[in-house]
Amino acid sequence: MRFTVTSRGDDVSNTLQQKIKRYLLDFGLTLDEQEPDIVITVGGDGTLLHAFHRYTSRLEDTAFVGIHTGHLGFYADWVPDEVEKLVIHIAKTPYQIVEYPLLEVVVRHTDESESKRLLALNECTVKSQEGSLVSNVEIKGDVFEVFRGDGLCISTPSGSTAYNKALGGAILHPSLASIQISEMASINNRVYRTIGSPLVLPQHHTCLIKPLNQVELQVTIDHFTLAYKRVKSIQCRVAEEKIRFARFRPFPFWKRVKESFIGDS
């Protein structure tokens, strides 16, 4: 089996990274940073997000497992004290694959130049660089509303616990192949109206955001921030690809949510 280990970059994570490499090499596994079968991330959710974006071209062939040394390890199943146990599992135990849905984002330009396709594990946000975002929001080809406000957040089920949750969105189980649209400070008065509620779209529904004024847009894809001019539309839907996690023991989603946000009662 080919593996690689990525680190958050702090001393604790770097030490664990080197320790895991030594252990797995001693077990006869092959270190391969280009085409790994399994990616072990040491840090927090940000470390796993970086690893995901590095290996998006290998999602069908690569599984991820996280060790939590950060402040929030929603995607991490293991803690530093369990490193030796995890290494033995990786070297000797067949693992279960658990798949989570991803978000596909396609940015198209008014000059009909080549479109840009992106994948997000957590969310995509769309904002105007100059004041409020004013755009048509289409669902399945029909105009649903004219949105006016700070911006829109489109999240995956696993990403529903991140920025989406802070916006008052619902937490969705990753077994639901869906995306969620949440508003950022929408303008609602006698003249302008939006739905004012998060929307959950199933796998076969597409959301199309069409700016009504030609301003520069700020688009975030997870931890990346991009600037686009002359945007014709931003299309969001459930991606065909999925992220694959290597599971060596049960870790129920709702238990993960409770431990991340509520703690022990």
From Swiss-Prot:
InterPro entries: ATP-NAD_kinase_N, ATP-NAD_kinase_PpnK-typ_C, NAD/diacylglycerol_kinase_sf, NADK. GO terms for biological process: NAD metabolic process; NADP biosynthetic process. It comes from the Bacteria. NAD(+) binds at residues 45-46, 50, 122-123, 148, 150, 185. It is found in: Cytoplasm. Involved in the regulation of the intracellular balance of NAD and NADP, and is a key enzyme in the biosynthesis of NADP. Catalyzes specifically the phosphorylation on 2'-hydroxyl of the adenosine moiety of NAD to yield NADP. The active site is at residue 45. It comes from Halalkalibacterium halodurans (strain ATCC BAA-125 / DSM 18197 / FERM 7344 / JCM 9153 / C-125) (Bacillus halodurans). Its cofactor is a divalent metal cation. Keywords: ATP-binding, Cytoplasm, Kinase, NAD, NADP, Nucleotide-binding, Transferase. It catalyses: NAD(+) + ATP = ADP + NADP(+) + H(+). SUPFAM superfamilies: NAD kinase/diacylglycerol kinase-like. Its main location: cytoplasm. Belongs to the NAD kinase family. Its EC number is 2.7.1.23. Pfam families: NAD_kinase, NAD_kinase_C. GO terms for molecular function: ATP binding; metal ion binding; NAD binding; NAD+ kinase activity. This is NAD kinase 1. The gene is nadK1. The keyword Ribonucleoprotein does not apply. One of its GO terms (cellular component) is cytoplasm.
